[in-house]
């Protein structure tokens, strides 16, 4: 299959089951088996899905030199995915918390750290040159890649995940 270049958010996501919205105040809630953490983010989710479909993927993303960043690297390696494009240049790895109720309603709190102000470091162009498709997810550090991918005459795909 083809080599796909993916640039997008990587974060550690924690989901929390709640009884409903609005969440009534209490000093402590005990949602037994209702709190889960996983490596996620649009970039990871797209790369993981395409990897499972048999494509060679190279995810380019920003994480931090922290425990959450270690978790990201371990999860990608366990999935058999390349970590070559992961840059540990943020002060900390982005994280999110998602509250969800039994009806499926959810509220997402996302801490992007300095993702929106930090570009991908130099060195991604050889991978972009070799790819058959540049998948550039909706995060600021992907924007500058549009011009490079166009200059290299690459097919470009972008996501729209919130309307």
Set out the residue ranges of the language-model regions.
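Short, well-ordered alpha-helical microsegments
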Residues: 69, 94, 142-146
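A glycine-rich beta-to-alpha transition motif near the start of alpha/beta enzyme domains, typified by
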Residues: 56-84
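Conserved beta-strand edge residues that scaffold enzyme active sites
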Residues: 64-65, 90-91, 163
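Glycine-rich phosphate/adenosyl-contacting loop at the front of the ribokinase-like
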Residues: 1-60, 69, 154
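Short beta-strand scaffold segments in enzyme catalytic cores
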Residues: 48, 95-99, 107
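Ribokinase/PfkB-type carbohydrate-kinase core domain
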Residues: 2-12, 75-88, 101-163
């Amino acid at each position: 299959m083809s080599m796909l270049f993916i640039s997008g958010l990587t974060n550690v996501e924690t989901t929390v089951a709640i009884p409903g919205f609005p969440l009534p105040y209490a000093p402590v809630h005990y949602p037994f088996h209702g709190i889960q953490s996983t490596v996620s983010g649009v970039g990871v989710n797209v790369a993981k899905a395409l990897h499972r479909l048999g494509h060679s993927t190279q995810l380019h993303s920003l994480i931090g030199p922290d425990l959450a960043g270690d978790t990201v690297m371990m999860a990608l390696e366990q999935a058999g995915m390349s970590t070559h494009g992961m840059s540990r240049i943020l002060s900390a790895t982005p994280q999110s918390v998602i509250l969800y109720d039994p009806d499926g309603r959810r509220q997402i709190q996302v801490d992007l750290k300095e993702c929106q102000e930090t570009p991908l470091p130099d060195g991604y162009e050889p991978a972009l040159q070799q790819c058959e498709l540049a998948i550039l997810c909706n995060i600021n550090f992907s924007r500058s890649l549009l011009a490079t991918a166009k200059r290299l005459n690459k097919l470009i795909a972008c996501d729209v995940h919130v309307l």
